[in-house]
Curated annotation (Swiss-Prot):
It catalyses: N(6)-[(R)-S(8)-aminomethyldihydrolipoyl]-L-lysyl-[protein] + (6S)-5,6,7,8-tetrahydrofolate = N(6)-[(R)-dihydrolipoyl]-L-lysyl-[protein] + (6R)-5,10-methylene-5,6,7,8-tetrahydrofolate + NH4(+). The keyword Ubl conjugation does not apply. Keywords: Aminotransferase, Transferase. Belongs to the GcvT family. NCBIfam families: gcvT (TIGR00528), PRK00389.1 (NF001567). The glycine cleavage system catalyzes the degradation of glycine. Gene3D superfamilies: Aminomethyltransferase beta-barrel domains, Aminomethyltransferase fragment, Probable tRNA modification gtpase trme, domain 1. HAMAP family: GcvT. PANTHER family: AMINOMETHYLTRANSFERASE (PTHR43757), AMINOMETHYLTRANSFERASE, MITOCHONDRIAL (PTHR43757:SF2). This is Aminomethyltransferase.
């Protein structure tokens, strides 16, 4: 059996009561207290996540912008220094290689943040399409990433830095910020549907940064959070998870992130199919389902109308915020109208559900 990969914070998990599981070959905490408590803390106060398993790749050189424009679906020429952009890499058939964030440091320096399970595959894909004048460097092992998410995140973080955090707007970042004596790339981004920050630092600095953030957040109700709450939070906000809402067989248009696909820019991998899907409508659509009958729609459960299979559940749970059994499902587009009644095959039972609006949770609602 191969040994699980560990983040620089692994030794701290036990100290904070973390329950460790195998997550795609990584030893990561699924929870510290309980998923519901951690979820609630992020929605009302704030939570601190270790997301150091994510991959970081530097793309540099005179041709970096041209290279990225061909590699990804969004228009990288639209971001300025200090801005971040959400985007995807696709195959020629429109299926998704990965979804990712791009940070622009300068015209010839970018940092890409990719999903942990896809690091090797993504880098191989990037190298396969590399051009002269571009360097691709995997800095994942020397980089740690923490996420402080929730309504009090800014107040807590401000006690540890002189950087005016209110000036860092959503999807903006500042490199070289001193937070509690640690040098951090600080980004106003996240994967929870809440306000918050993602903090990138050297792996060896991560434990001290984690401790300082927990300490500073104590009186504000900040708690350590695991992967379980990260998943329920992102699910309520309809943020896709690679391997569920996005796969090599599911396009960004189908998954509802068409805003990150700019078909009017110059040629990029997958453009032809994605342009067609955007203009004529994709054959499938990601929708929300709410159970009418009692049961929880889990990943992979099949969905039917009139005894015909029309799709499957990508993610489902009892929403901690709504207290309802809900799911995201990829359905044939003609069955995606709000209010449509469908049958979800939950184990051996056939249960009624209806198509509902998403996201299930929006900040400020």
């Amino acid at each position: 059996m191969t040994e699980l990969k560990k983040t620089p914070l692994f030794d701290l998990y036990e100290q904070y009561g973390g329950k460790v599981i195998d997550f795609g070959g990584w030893a990561l905490p699924v929870q510290f207290s309980s998923i519901k408590e951690e979820h609630e803390a992020v929605r009302t106060k704030a939570g601190l996540f270790d997301v150091s398993h994510m991959g970081e790749v530097e793309v540099t050189g005179a041709q970096a912008l041209n290279y990225l424009q061909r590699l990804v679906t969004n228009d990288v020429s639209k971001i300025k220094d200090g801005q971040a952009q959400y985007t995807a890499m696709c195959y020629e058939n429109g299926g998704t290689v990965d979804d990712l964030l791009i940070y622009r440091r300068s015209e010839d320096q970018y940092l890409l943040v990719i999903n942990a399970a896809n690091i090797d595959k993504d880098i191989a894909w990037m190298e396969k399409h590399a051009i002269d004048g571009v360097s691709i460097t995997n800095v994942s092992n020397q980089t740690a990433q923490l996420a402080l998410q929730g309504p009090v995140a800014e107040n807590v973080l401000q006690t540890l830095t002189e950087e005016p955090l209110a000036d860092i707007k959503f999807f903006r970042f500042v490199d070289g910020v001193n937070i509690a004596g640690v040098n951090v790339l600080l980004s106003r981004t996240g994967y929870t549907g809440e306000d918050g920050f993602e903090l990138y630092c050297l792996a060896e600095d991560a434990p001290v940064l984690w401790k300082k953030l927990i300490e500073a957040g104590k009186e504000h109700g900040v708690v350590p959070c695991g992967l379980g709450a990260r998943d329920t939070l992102r699910f309520e906000a309809k943020l896709p998870l690679y391997g569920q809402e996005l796969t090599k067989d599911i396009s960004p248009i189908e998954a509802g992130i068409g805003f990150a696909v700019k078909v009017d820019k110059e040629d990029f991998i997958g453009k032809e199919i994605l342009k067609k899907q955007k203009e004529q409508g994709a054959p499938r659509k990601l929708v929300g389902l709410e159970m009418v009958d009692k049961g929880i729609p889990r990943t992979g459960y099949e969905v039917y109308v009139d005894n015909q299979k029309i799709g499957f559940v990508t993610t489902g749970t009892q929403s901690p915020t709504l207290k309802k059994n809900v799911g995201l499902a990829l359905l044939q587009a003609e069955h995606s109208e709000l209010g449509t009644e469908v049958i979800v095959h939950v184990r051996k039972r056939q249960l009624i559900a209806k198509v509902v609006a998403t996201p299930f949770y929006k900040r400020g609602n």
